[in-house]
Each structure stands twice: as C-alpha cells, then as structure tokens.
Amino acid sequence: MLKISNLRYEILRDVIISDFSLQLRAGEVKTLFGPSGCGKTSLLRLVCGLEDKKSGQIENGFKKISFLFQENRLLPNLTALKNIEIFSPAGVSEIYALAAKIGLSLSDLNKFPRELSGGMQKRTAFLRTILSGCDLALFDEPFVGLDRDLRGVLIEILVSKIEREGLACLLVTHDRFEAARLSHEIIELEPKGMGLRRVVGLDEPLSARDERYEERVVSEQFGGVSYYE
C-alpha cells in the first residue's frame, strides 16, 4: 500500500502541496484531477523520490515503482526494443505481441527514438512502463496526443494489467473521460495547494466500462465537459 499523510511541498517558499493525504492499495486506480499548476505532477515526483517533501509522510509498501512522464524520456542510444527490454522481465515474445496490438512493428522496435514519431515514442514508453515488473505505476497524462482508437487499445492493455496482476496506479489527467474509464476514485483538486474539492468513487469493474459508461459518468459528475476548465 502507498500511504501519504499530511504532505507539504514548497518551492522557494511557494506552497505547492499543503496537507495532502491519500491511500492506494494493490489493484486500485486513483486519479488526480485538477487544473495545471495545482501540484499533481509534483506529487508523482515526490512519490518516486525525485523531489523532497517539506513535511508529512510518504510510506510506500510497493516493491517497484515505474513512472510514465509526460515527456517520453526514452534512452536515445538504445532501440525501442532495448528501451523496453532493459527494464523488463518480460520475454521478447510478450513485448512483440503487445507492440503489435498498439501498432508498433518489428521494424519500429528496431529503430532508435529519433527515428520514431512522437506517438510511437509515447507508445514505446507506455510499454516500457507496464512491462517493467512494477507493482505501482505513476502516469502523467499518458494518452495525450493519441487518437481515440489507439487510446482505447492502450487502456484495454492497462486494465488487463490492473485486474490480472493487481497493478496499482496513480494517474494524472485533464481528461474527464479518461478519469471515468480508468478510476476507482477521482480526486478533484483545488487550483492551489492540492486542496481537496471532492472525491468521486466509481464501483463498476474497469473491464466492464465502455464509452457509454464514460459518457454517463462525465454527464452526471462533470456536466458533460471533457477537459478541466
């Protein structure tokens, strides 16, 4: 379990996160939903140790964390395949099978990041994250720039990992439809300090959700608007 208690984070005395608490268990997905600059990405960086907190506690009982940044952050001197393999206990056959599902050919996997489009790099980074053997995954806007069909395939792969292997996920998104599709709990935040506006709990199993479910939740909870305004 990940347990965050009364967390405070500052940059040059500017309070980014103030008194924030959260618990995340195996197989759960919790989504941080709020405007840009409210501290969502900072929280992910604190969880994985890239930033130092001012006060509070972060207790992580998971064995391995993987972080899918907004930027793809592939190693430039390795092929797409090697970028995945170097962090993954999965066999090459599993990598090939999942890559084919998301439109990456064997030829694509043997290319260096600079030879791939931005979308291909994003898909490679996604595979690297979910095949890393992690039991806690941090996702920062993982589907931005992907078309609707491709987004759906990636979500199906992620949901399978969550439900079959108990992967825990902390997700940052501005997209209400993504939040409705993937979250057990949507944590809606105030514009400053990661203040809690409200929590929306969703009980429907992830694998039972579809676009109609997304639309219903968005309409009921957010008035039908897709992006945080």
Describe the residue ranges of each PLM region.
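Hydrophobic anchor residue at the start of the ABC signature
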Residues: 126
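Catalytic Walker B motif of ABC-type/P-loop ATPase nucleotide-binding domains
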Residues: 137-141
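Helix-to-loop junction immediately C-terminal to a conserved catalytic motif
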Residues: 48
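Conserved ABC ATPase "signature" region
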Residues: 92-108, 160
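The feature captures the beta-strand-to-loop junction immediately N-terminal to the Walker
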Residues: 33-35
